[in-house]
Amino acid sequence: MNKILFYFFFFLTLILSATVYLFGGPMMLFFINYKTDLLKVDDVYNHEIYSNQSAAIPKIIHQTWKTNEIPEKWVGAQKSCIDLHPDYEYVLWTDESMREFIATDYPWFLTQYDSYPYNIERADVVRYFILYKYGGIYLDLDVGCNRTLDPLLHYPAWVRRTSPSGISNNVMGFAKGHPFLLQVVRNLPRFAFNYHFPYLTVMYSTGPLFLSIIWSAWRKLPDAEAWHHIWVMVPELYEKSHHAFFEIYEGSSWHDSDAGFVFYMLHHWAIFTFLGFLTFFIVVYFIFGYALKPAARVSRTGRRVFSSPFSKTSPSRWKIFHRFTSSNEKYDQTRSDSLPFMSDYDLESQTQSHSP
């Protein structure tokens, strides 16, 4: 009995530990107070704090794709950003130029770069290195521009808030050599792990969840200078608003089938949390309320005696928990059968021996 309980709690501890390891960081994102981090509409058009300074972010727009030939569905998005920013440098990084960039400027990371199982992971990590070295604004190819991005250049570091919590890496602006990005690239090897589910692997190793966890730790550090602050763009500045800087086109489809289930869980997190706790309590109740419930035995005087499930004389409800009684604890079959309250107690189903 004690051994069974030990294994039960041992595996329960393993499951809980794995859950905390996988979801502890993301769950903490729900408790972040964004008030001091939000980049609001009024802030963008009233940047007196930077009025006497030049733009912190250089006028460079970075995008990535496999080759120089991007899909037709994103040509409009790309053209909108180029046309609105004739004085910006535009760079489209390809798979070939991205790997060459890592090999030349960050050779210590090349082995890790090549080892990622999914190409989207390489596209994720290279944007962090590019923005750290050159600065500028990174946009996914499915992000078009509604207006000039000049007002955003006065904020040394900005990202956008994502749902249900955390930040995204599909739209980012950083000054060259920003220390937050240095912290990001230094942590990439530590988070490089294959979870065997494409969506979880990408999100945790290089994607938005990874970036959100690093940002959550970063914002707890002493903010000595405003230059180190990471601004989080409110949804009104991102899309679907007359203040929005961007327009979202049809996105890429790197998500696998597991992503659909994860998205469903995120949208119904309260239900799944309730079901998780309910399952846990049902298992605990079944173990302690039924399988380990003290069972009745018959004493020599014919009385029903309830003993502890840990007792060697306790006939358990499960055969796996059964304890054989010693030879000196034999029951009187004749007397037991004559007792009315024993009519529903099948002694023959127990593995105890009886005297004739």
UniProtKB/Swiss-Prot annotation:
One GO molecular-function entry: mannosyltransferase activity
EC number(s) from the headed UniProt entry: 2.4.-.-
EC class name: transferase
Protein location: Endoplasmic reticulum membrane; Golgi apparatus, cis-Golgi network membrane; Golgi apparatus, trans-Golgi network membrane
Kinase listed as a keyword: no
PTM-bearing positions, type Phosphoserine: 307, 353, 355
Residues annotated as transmembrane: 4-24, 197-217, 269-289
Keyword Glycoprotein: yes
Alphabetical UniProt keywords: Endoplasmic reticulum, Glycoprotein, Glycosyltransferase, Golgi apparatus, Membrane, Phosphoprotein, Transferase, Transmembrane, Transmembrane helix
Membrane topology: Multi-pass membrane protein
Family affiliation: Belongs to the glycosyltransferase 32 family.
Protein name as catalogued: Inositol phosphoceramide mannosyltransferase 3
Lineage start: Eukaryota, Fungi, Dikarya, Ascomycota, Taphrinomycotina
